[in-house]
């Protein structure tokens, strides 16, 4: 199994798709990596030789991927929360951050409904 950026990429898939299993690499970036390294995107991972894998590793080293990228994103959110800006407070309260309405239609972010009983008369 080919190991790139600390991730075992699936052997049976095309290289173009297999690279997307690495956090931080989508289809567009995978295509750019393959073009830059000169590896054919249509071959399967199991058919790659060691030279191709080395080329892919060398090109992916240029990007922030996996743990470093997760840490970077976490630090950005923590910074927003620490400075107390609106976005940081919304993240802390698990509410929509980008101005969406919350009276209705915020179920994904707010979680399941918590039913409140009506007042007895």
From Swiss-Prot:
An example GO biological process term is: translation
Q: Which gene encodes it?
A: rpsM
UniProtKB keywords:
Ribonucleoprotein, Ribosomal protein, RNA-binding, rRNA-binding, tRNA-binding
Give a GO molecular function annotation for the protein: structural constituent of ribosome
- Homology family: Belongs to the universal ribosomal protein uS13 family.
- Subunit structure comment from the entry: Part of the 30S ribosomal subunit. Forms a loose heterodimer with protein S19. Forms two bridges to the 50S subunit in the 70S ribosome.
Q: A single GO CC term, please?
A: cytosol
Query: Which segments show compositional bias classed as Basic residues?
Result: 100-121
Function, as annotated: Located at the top of the head of the 30S subunit, it contacts several helices of the 16S rRNA. In the 70S ribosome it contacts the 23S rRNA (bridge B1a) and protein L5 of the 50S subunit (bridge B1b), connecting the 2 subunits; these bridges are implicated in subunit movement. Contacts the tRNAs in the A and P-sites.
Q: Which PROSITE patterns match?
A: RIBOSOMAL_S13_1, RIBOSOMAL_S13_2
Protein name, UniProt field? Small ribosomal subunit protein uS13
What organism, scientifically named, is this protein from? Answer: Prochlorococcus marinus (strain NATL1A)
Task: Please name the Pfam families in this protein's record.
Answer: Ribosomal_S13
The record, for InterPro entries, names: Rbsml_uS13_C, Ribosomal_uS13, Ribosomal_uS13-like_H2TH, Ribosomal_uS13_bac-type, Ribosomal_uS13_CS
Q: Where is this region: Disordered?
A: 97-121
Q: Where are the transmembrane segments?
A: none
């Amino acid at each position: 199994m080919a190991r790139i950026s600390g991730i075992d990429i699936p052997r049976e898939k095309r290289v173009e798709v297999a690279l997307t299993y690495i956090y931080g690499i989508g289809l567009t970036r995978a295509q750019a990596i393959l073009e830059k390294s000169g590896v054919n995107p249509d071959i399967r991972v199991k058919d790659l030789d060691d030279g191709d894998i080395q080329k892919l590793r060398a090109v992916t080293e240029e990007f922030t991927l996996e743990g470093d990228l997760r840490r970077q994103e976490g630090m950005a959110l923590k910074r927003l929360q620490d400075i107390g800006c609106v976005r940081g407070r919304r993240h802390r309260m698990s509410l929509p951050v980008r101005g969406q309405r919350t009276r209705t239609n915020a179920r994904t972010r707010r979680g399941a409904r918590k039913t409140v009983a009506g007042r007895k008369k």
